Amino acid sequence: MTGMSLRTVVFGLILSLVCVRAAHARTDFPGMLPASAERAASVAPAPPADTLPAAPADPFPAAVSADTLSAAAFPAPADSLGATAAARKRSFVRRIIDYFGESTQDRTFEKKIDFTFAGGPSYSKNTSLGIGILAAGLYRLDRTDSVTVPSDVSLYANVSVSGFYSVGIEGNTIFAHNRQRVDYTLEFSSAPTYTWGIGYNDVQKDDKRSYTEQRYEIKARYLREILPHAYIGGLLSFDHAQASKYDGETPLFGDQRLRYTTTGLGLTVEYDSRDFIPNPFKGIYLSFQNIFYPKGLGTCDKLLQRMTFTADFYQRVWTDCILAFDLYGEFNSSGTPWPMLARMGGNQRMRGYYKGQYTDNDLITAQLELRQRVWRRIGCVAWAGAGNVFPTFREFDWAETLPNYGFGLRWELKKRVNIRLDYGFGKNTDSFLLSINEAF
């Protein structure tokens, strides 16, 4: 999902916590069940012995969605005049509590697909007032297989009065014994945004321009295990982007067109020993992707190429504390059009920077994060990192490296599936973000 779409649906979660908490206070329940609604995270029925201890039930039920802030709106019942009415109202609230409480349980052995739904009003400074909905599901291709982790799928939609919208589906399909995987993303979005130009020096001029970016993306990968934890596979990518409603009279991106369509075909090689993908406690993840965009399969004027590299490492350092490291690089061929350039920022890397403020052909980022469970479902993190955008390796300038650091809170929805609240800082910038699952 996009950064704004995840923030849109997640804010609804916070509102639902307040509403159901208020209902609990008026109806005098002895306690509430733990809650969650989550985009599919592959949770094995029996976690490894060295995982962090399971958190006790939390009194706040919640539901989460995609990448902008959003909340499941469930109004608390009004004070009643009679015992019968009160019983009916308590029954309604209890059904809500039970619904989210049961979503923490693995029902993939009983159901073909176990869906959880959430939705409600949303607001953020980027997207304004809106509404978002989410359906997150877990399923198993073989419900007699207790070794393979569940597959997941998420469907989401967001719309706001500012003109922002996002509709999409994404997921991971895991085959028997994790020997084959398919992951996919399909998204349609339109977002009012800004551009500062291309390159580090353009940002220093502080001359941003507004425009609306519409995007249609389809991405899919197939991976097959060839050695223990080692995978090889292919990928397909289709991307259509166009800019409109821009301010100013000069061209928005110089002599580049405002609309591009690209189709990419590529190869992926990975080593993945992580114990749990959304929130690893141990393991190593190495990934190399090489994608070619043929001229005849799009509107670009030449054959384009993109290479990406990821190296992640996770290790327990003391009780309930994980040290995580992430190194990421993205390298595009010369002449790459504006929609395909590397964009710094977002909710995964260089948190605190507006995504797209620093844009160029190539990008390298690194970050080190300490993750500590504090009490029950509550945890905290602190991180530090740096990043650089540059046109070519020969023009790489260490003096243009940008700092990044921040801290955050974690609340566990399901076992090892967290809502994260982060506040990131950078060069002359800072930003709050709310999302689901760890950043890397």
Across the structure, where does each feature detected by a protein language model lie?
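Outer membrane beta-barrel transmembrane domains
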Residues: 332-420
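Short loop/turn motifs that connect adjacent beta-strands in outer-membrane beta-barrel proteins
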Residues: 104-113, 141-150, 176-181, 227-229, ...
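Extracellular loop and loop/strand-boundary signature of outer-membrane beta-barrel proteins
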Residues: 155-156, 203-208, 249-256, 293-299, ...
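C-terminal outer-membrane beta-barrel translocator/porin domains of Gram-negative envelope proteins
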Residues: 265-266, 270, 275-373
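Membrane-embedded beta-strand positions of outer-membrane beta-barrel proteins
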Residues: 117-119, 135, 153-157, 182-186, ...
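Outer-membrane beta-barrel "beta-signal"
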Residues: 266-267, 406-413, 429-440
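Gram-negative/organellar outer-membrane beta-barrel architecture
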Residues: 107-117, 123-261, 418, 426-440
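Transmembrane beta-strand segments that form the barrel wall of outer-membrane beta-barrel proteins
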Residues: 114-123, 148-161, 167, 284-296, ...
